[in-house]
């Protein structure tokens, strides 16, 4: 059951055929059957002036004993907490009674100035809606899943005579077979690299494929079978593709046995060159499996979760098994109240984790979490198949879980060490530059271009827990009046766009209040930077400070410049800070290493963004400039005509003969390449 956000803040459920009749409940609380919009109802109590437990107590009087979801809001309208309940009256009533709450709950209750509610037909629906809202609203007092980047998959395309193999992330819009999820892009890259050697499947785009007149370098180094120029027959290539699918589907022994038989037969026929090819392909398959670590025979499709909770920090390690193969693992460090138990953290994490991800048939846990039966029912409803959640006690599966627990413990220890080191570095940064408090958010900027072309500005972000990659931003330089190679002009555009938008969305911060709250452990990650680092000298800093003054935020952000020394050697950097002469740091100063690391990360990110933009420009197709021609129609045209040049020469009747191209679209394409005829 997936929700779609509505303008009024509700969620529309649209994947059911059930009745849309309203559910009648007492009071003013709105019901939320599956097929109608979630109508949050706060009643009129927010105008009474009541706050905290008194306000909650008044709400309880009109709540039903129905399952549902509630939101607690502060005086500014920010969502403090989202929760679900089997009985709204009983669950919310717990906040109003005089019993002793934890510090976290007591603080949340004191700040509550309004509440909103929605009833659901079942507690399962309430659990799914709660997870959806927590991920979208990120309330301060909920357990929050960080680093929720989608997982990459391997895609073998199915809409071309010669299927290609790609890394894929996001919606499965393209026809083909998807294999995964993999824990990281690196794991996908290594697997594709080995699969190329084993099965010789192409990795080029369709537009490049259609324009080849001779095999590319990958064919020469035996990484592709050359279907573009018919170096391999269509039947032979289809067999290679099927073998790759079989291997990724868990039939690795069948594939390896077939290759071994072919190798032995070639050797018996004294065709040693062909035998060597099969030998190398077998070695490539073994290389794939050597990177997969443990592959338990009794686990076909499962995710394995283990939690290690110590020192107020939780680490949840996840291993992914599909088709009997280990596709990698990833560690998560959810934001949670240190007073919560590991079972409470794990339960909240699981519901959010699968909110936008495919659910496997089996989920294994290192320990029992809360409401496992309810969670299994909710995930089964979402996935459309039965999902079992178990805590293995013995045997191979218990050994597997223990292995994941060990990984969680090690990752937890590394995280604590890194966090402690980062805190010391931020304190040292504060002392070095004379700041009022240790910065909680540092933004580092750099530009990248080649002679002014495809210019990109990059922004990376660092904080108490290291680099915050979901806060990175890139800025494609758009100004036409900037002289090619004008770094000052590029930085001016980046700064203006960044802070103009920040002022519009967040307003100018109150630094006095922020300094007082800088050490609060439960404060959300700030949107405004305390410090910005610019990779440049006095000229860059003069331009940046002029922009900050123009925007009226000179006192809101500390700007620091980093200029390389005369010989441009690392360790000879000169720093430009406000209110003091430029200076250098001792070569072995830890703060200097810290700043160099941040600058190098900004440099890496800016160069990477520039390369992506340059690559897109290099493979840009004239069909991309035609409105209404998306990837599918572009692919259909290229498959029919071969090249964009052939499309430009095609007659209107020929364009209309292409599958998926209507008369209106054909005229649009024809007119684009024949402007005189259009006039």
Curated annotation (Swiss-Prot):
Compartment(s) where it occurs, according to its Swiss-Prot or TrEMBL record: Cytoplasm
Main location: cytoplasm
Keywords annotated in UniProt: Cytoplasm, DNA damage, DNA excision, DNA repair, Excision nuclease, SOS response
DNA damage in keyword set: yes
PROSITE patterns attached to this UniProt entry: GIY_YIG (PS50164), UVR (PS50151), UVRC (PS50165)
GO terms of biological process kind: nucleotide-excision repair; SOS response
Location of the GIY-YIG domain: 65-143
Domain UVR: 253-288
CC annotations in GO: cytoplasm; excinuclease repair complex
Coiled coil, from the record: none
CDD domains: GIY-YIG_UvrC_Cho (cd10434)
Annotated GO MF terms: DNA binding; excinuclease ABC activity
Keyword Lyase: no
SUPFAM superfamilies cross-referenced by the UniProt entry: C-terminal UvrC-binding domain of UvrB, GIY-YIG endonuclease, RuvA domain 2-like
Quaternary structure (record): Interacts with UvrB in an incision complex.
Family: Belongs to the UvrC family.
Function comment: The UvrABC repair system catalyzes the recognition and processing of DNA lesions. UvrC both incises the 5' and 3' sides of the lesion. The N-terminal half is responsible for the 3' incision and the C-terminal half is responsible for the 5' incision.
Protein name (record): UvrABC system protein C
Organism: Rhizobium etli (strain ATCC 51251 / DSM 11541 / JCM 21823 / NBRC 15573 / CFN 42)
Gene name per UniProt: uvrC
